[in-house]
């Protein structure tokens, strides 16, 4: 994974191979080392060996860098929902798709944790967070709407979308704070409880599964 995009000869503009992903890697490193507020677009561009103009070809602001992967997740959600067979129950489909889209390689987890910690701790990112979470929620609501034959902005699809988002944000927060289990286990436990209407027996079963996973990780 490239972290230095400088090219020789003092060439200005976009070096060969510069991409949104490469700028993202550099920006995340700078955010970690210097803080989000003290890292300017100029600093990111300089570290990448590109101009500010090139940076803005990829991102509208430095905050957008943190949401690059998230936007891809929303697209992946929609694509996965489109492939779900109609006989799969609604909440089972949502649980399956959300957990599947959030399977990360072990080497990508530290970066994901850094990203989520920044999003959760920097006040300046809250407005962009609201916009992105809304797009994620709409992906769920749109799928629910197609299943029940109602407009996406009607009560039931909106309820499904917002409840699912709340459950997943709780799972993300818990995972980010503890680092004791795979993210998918936290998501699966939260969505299983939601699908069961937070029935106490279902919650105990999900909690037991999560606890067993944590115990296995502790001895490996």
Which role fits each region the language model picked out?
Residues 50-59:
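Short hydrophobic/aromatic patch on the recognition helix
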Residues 130, 147-193:
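Hydrophobic/aromatic-rich alpha-helical bundle segments in the mid-to-C-terminal region
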Residues 73, 132-136, 140, 190:
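Hydrophobic/aromatic residues within well-ordered alpha-helical segments
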Residues 63-73:
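Alpha-helical DNA-contacting segments of helix-turn-helix folds
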Residues 107, 122, 134-160:
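Hydrophobic alpha-helical bundle segments that form small-molecule/ligand-binding pockets
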């Amino acid at each position: 994974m490239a972290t230095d995009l400088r090219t020789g000869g003092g060439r200005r503009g976009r070096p060969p191979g510069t991409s949104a992903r490469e700028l993202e890697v550099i920006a995340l490193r700078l955010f970690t080392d210097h803080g989000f507020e003290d890292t300017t677009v100029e600093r990111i561009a300089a570290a990448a060996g590109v101009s500010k103009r090139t940076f803005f070809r990829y991102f509208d602001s430095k905050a957008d860098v943190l949401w690059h992967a998230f936007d891809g997740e929303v697209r992946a959600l929609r694509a996965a929902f489109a492939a779900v067979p109609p006989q799969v129950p609604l909440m089972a489909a949502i649980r399956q798709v959300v957990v599947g889209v959030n399977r990360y390689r072990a080497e990508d987890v530290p970066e994901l944790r850094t990203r989520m910690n920044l999003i959760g701790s920097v006040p300046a990112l809250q407005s962009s967070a609201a916009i992105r979470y809304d797009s994620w929620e709409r992906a769920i609501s749109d799928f629910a709407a197609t299943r029940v034959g109602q407009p996406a902005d009607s009560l039931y699809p909106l309820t499904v979308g917002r409840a699912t988002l709340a459950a997943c944000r709780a799972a993300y927060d818990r995972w980010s704070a503890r680092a004791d289990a795979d993210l998918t286990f936290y998501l699966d436990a939260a969505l299983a409880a939601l699908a069961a209407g937070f029935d106490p027996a279902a919650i105990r079963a999900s909690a037991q599964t999560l606890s067993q996973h944590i115990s296995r990780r502790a001895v490996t």
